[in-house]
Design a protein with these regions (language model features):
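Canonical Rossmann dinucleotide-binding motif of NAD(H)/NADP(H)-dependent dehydrogenases/reductases
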Residues: 1-28
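Amphipathic, non-transmembrane alpha-helical secondary structure
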Residues: 14, 18, 22, 39, ...
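Conserved glycine-rich Rossmann-like NAD(P)H-binding loop of the short-chain dehydrogenase/reductase
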Residues: 23-40
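Hydrophobic anchor at the start of a short beta-strand
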Residues: 27, 52-53
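The beta1-alpha1 cofactor-binding region of Rossmann-like NAD(H)/NADP(H)-dependent oxidoreductases
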Residues: 35-36, 57-70
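Short, conserved SAM-binding/catalytic segment
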Residues: 41-49
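A glycine-rich helix->loop->beta "capping" turn
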Residues: 49-52, 72-86
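Conserved NAD(P)H cofactor-binding loop of Rossmann-fold oxidoreductase domains
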Residues: 87-91
Length: 91
């Protein structure tokens, strides 16, 4: 099982990513500007939960970047994502 969580580096998105990893999902964590937070979460999920995890940057307003995000998530997680959590927002 593979999931992509948009806005997954902090707050609710972070908790969703951890929740999914705890339940057996490999997780792609999307971020726009929170690279350090995303990288720390990837380390946590890999080391503490033993799941494949990757942080991927994209501007979700840009269609080409969204397509690249999905392709890279599929590539890095070893197959197509089966779960998409649209959590990204603008504060």
């Amino acid at each position: 099982m593979r999931a992509l969580v948009t806005g997954g580096a902090k707050r609710l998105g972070k908790e969703i990513a951890i929740f999914l990893a705890e339940r057996g999902f490999d997780v792609a964590i999307h971020y726009h500007s929170s690279e350090n937070s995303a990288d720390e979460l990837v380390k946590y999920i890999k080391s503490k939960l033993g799941k494949n995890c990757v942080a991927l940057r994209a501007d979700l307003i840009n269609e080409k970047e969204v397509q690249t995000l999905i392709s890279r998530a599929n590539e890095n997680l070893g197959g197509p994502i089966s779960c998409l959590v649209n959590n990204a927002s603008i504060f």
